[in-house]
Design a protein with these regions (language model features):
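Blade-level signature of beta-propeller repeat domains, shared across WD40, Kelch, NHL, RCC1
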Residues: 305-331
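C-terminal motif of bacterial Sec signal peptides marking the signal peptidase cleavage site
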Residues: 24-25
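A short helix->beta-strand "capping" segment at the edge of beta-propeller domains
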Residues: 33-47
Length: 331
């Protein structure tokens, strides 16, 4: 009888342990919940006849600009998906688009060796910037709206006065073509990524190189500042995204696990998540503090070339080689 009671007590203890483990396992962890997100297809925007190479949200989040290999830029209503304007003027592929901070203008660069500044409301060309035979591969507007930066095939970065189109400064330091450029949120610094596999952070006013960030093993395709300006994300043909400390140049995280080349990275407004575009026909969301966290959303039928978060962080736009733009809802 005593042995039976002892055995029953053991069973009771074991059951209590199991129930306790189940309770702990099912309990919600607020910190974990904060890191969870979901991405759902909202709408597909059709209007381009060739690959969509670049997408960019207007500062108020109401419009979207897309640049395509059909030589055009399209302005979309982000809420309805309606085509508002088709900007025609480039003679060859459009490879990069960006909005001015006040939302009045869109800048685009093309394989036709021109940069065009457009009136976003009327669709008219405001001015055309040229550098002879020097092609510009990426454009980025300064936060104050006064300057436009362009990375070029001549291994340098040109800074234009956006108000009159005058070239005011050239930044030299890369040993190969500059594929991507991005201004820091405070406008003091510029980041550039090159075919030479390096990222350079520049002091724009002084025109000097502050840091050279080495770590990628192939051509850089995209650089993007965190909203607070403390970190920089870069994506490359080596299929990796690297997070850098923008002050020291130290690597703080390497986000791997992508199957193919990384073409575009975009930081969410919360500073915790990155959107990534790769050779795969999908959009990838990454937690910048957890390299194991990967979420994928499928919707495109061709390589995803560009991703861009809306200013409020609730939507994401992607452009791809299936000639479409997709808007995603993100929670």
């Amino acid at each position: 009888m005593q042995e039976k009671n002892t055995e029953m007590n053991r069973i009771k203890v074991l059951m209590l342990v199991i129930f306790a483990a189940l309770f702990v396992g099912c309990e919600n962890n607020p910190e974990d919940e904060d890191e969870l997100f979901s991405i759902k297809h909202a709408k597909t925007l059709e209007g381009h006849t060739e690959w969509v190479y670049s997408v960019s949200w207007s500062p108020d989040g109401k419009k979207l600009a897309s640049g395509s290999w059909d030589n055009t830029v399209i302005i979309w209503d982000a809420n309805t998906g309606a085509k508002l304007k088709t900007l025609e003027g480039h003679r060859w592929y459009v490879i990069s688009v960006c909005w001015s901070p006040d939302g009045k203008y869109v800048a685009s660069c093309s394989e036709d060796k021109t940069v065009i500044i457009w009136d976003a409301n009327t669709g008219e060309q405001v001015r055309t910037l040229e550098r002879g035979d020097n092609r510009v591969l990426s454009v980025s507007w300064s936060p104050d709206g006064n300057y436009l930066a362009g990375g070029s095939v001549e291994n340098d970065i040109v800074i234009w006065d956006a108000n009159n189109g005058q070239e005011i400064k050239t930044l030299e330091g890369h040993s190969d073509r500059v594929i991507t450029v991005s201004w820091s949120p405070d406008g003091r610094y510029l980041a550039s990524g090159s075919k030479d596999k390096n990222v350079i952070i520049w002091d724009v006013n002084a025109g000097t190189e502050l840091l050279t960030l080495e770590g990628h093993t192939n051509t850089l395709n995209s650089v993007c500042w965190s909203p607070d300006g403390k970190h920089l994300a870069s994506g490359a043909y080596d299929a990796n995204v690297i997070i850098w400390d923008a002050k020291t140049g130290a690597k703080t995280q390497i986000l791997d696990g992508h199957n193919f080349s990384v073409y575009s990275v975009s930081w969410n407004a919360d500073g915790k998540h990155l959107a990534v575009a790769t050779t795969d026909p999908e959009v990838i969301l990454r937690d910048v503090n957890n390299r194991e966290s990967i979420q994928k959303a499928k919707g495109h039928f061709g390589t995803t070339r560009s991703v861009s978060w809306s200013p409020d962080g609730k939507k994401l736009a992607s452009g791809a080689c299936d000639n479409t733009v997709i808007i995603w809802n993100v929670k």
